[in-house]
Amino acid sequence: MESSGSSKVRWGQNRRLNFIDVRLQYDGRINRSDLMQFFDISAPQASADLGLYQQLAGDNLVYDTRQRIYLATPEFKPITKRSEATRYLNELQRLARGIVEPDESFVGYQPSTGVVVSPSRAIEADEVATLLRAIRDRVALRVRYQSMDAPEPQEWVLSPHALGFDGLRWHARAWCHARQVFRDFAIGRLDVLEHVFSAKPVDPLLDEGWNNEVTVSLVPHPGLTPSQRRVVMRDYGMVDGHCELRCRKAMLFYTLRHLNLESLAISDVPAQQHVVVENAEEVKQWMREDRDGLQHLRR
């Protein structure tokens, strides 16, 4: 269901089957008008889509003649990845943040939803467009950048090759021609001044921190009770008592900071730190190898 077909018709039909699956999974019901209103299709087309879904997963739904709707059966089993809980909850978050409009989302009934708010980053569309084109065309840029290590802005010639998100802000991953190093530059702190076509192109494959991945292994805090450890393992989706997070080496500190584990210390209060880093010595070595991690990204 997730892969698109060879034509627009096939892709559209797959999307409508996904819609049916999601609505049955979470709303427990669907009717023709749901499909007709969301996709702007005819009643015969909606009936055909519901009929096809019945052919694919007949045990998932039953028609209630009194209510004139299809109801999910107790034996319902989703047939598409769109019905996964994580994707559904992410969609609720996007709706709550206003990233998507209700008429663009497969979510039917939307419960009252609250999300942690973050400052709105002042990033200009023109700056992002310029960075994207520089990455695509392998062109260097002269920028004015305000580092947190310097009292005043400085000008640098950068060759950006990727974008990264640390959970709060977006960064441009770029080669700094003056310092001869790959670094992260917060997009909201830079102003593009001009293109520098004379700068020597830099191969992004040389950025070992970006191209190499590392694995952080998390385990329950040793001070938790057996019952607490079990619920933490379930909450984090642990297998055999631990879960593994793979990330780019250059994103390692961001990942740890996002989990409030950047110090790698084990708290004396397990209730405040549910998990600890199992391979802390490995992580320390990776952090030492990455200059940005060693400096704790103070820029």
UniProtKB/Swiss-Prot annotation:
Protein's UniProt name: DNA-binding transcriptional repressor CapW
Function (record text): Transcriptional regulator of a CBASS antivirus system. CBASS (cyclic oligonucleotide-based antiphage signaling system) provides immunity against bacteriophage. The CD-NTase protein synthesizes cyclic nucleotides in response to infection; these serve as specific second messenger signals. The signals activate a diverse range of effectors, leading to bacterial cell death and thus abortive phage infection. A type III CBASS system, part of a CapW-Cap6-Cap8-Cap7-CdnC-NucC locus.
Subunit structure: Homodimer.
DNA-binding recorded as keyword: yes
A Pfam family this chain is assigned to: WYL
Ranges for region WYL domain: 85-196
Ranges where the record places region WCX domain: 197-299
Inducing factors: Represses its own transcription.
Effect of R32A: No longer binds cognate promoter DNA
Mutation effect (R183A): No change in promoter DNA affinity
Region (Winged HTH domain): 1-84
Keywords: Antiviral defense, DNA-binding, Repressor, Transcription, Transcription regulation
Effect caused by changing D235A: No change in promoter DNA affinity
Gene Ontology molecular function terms on file: DNA binding
Record remark: domains: Has an N-terminal winged HTH domain, a central WYL domain and a C-terminal WCX domain; the WYL domain of each subunit reaches into the other subunit to form swapped domains.
Region (Probable ligand-binding region) residue spans: 145-189
Residue intervals of the WYL domain: 120-200
GO biological process: defense response to virus
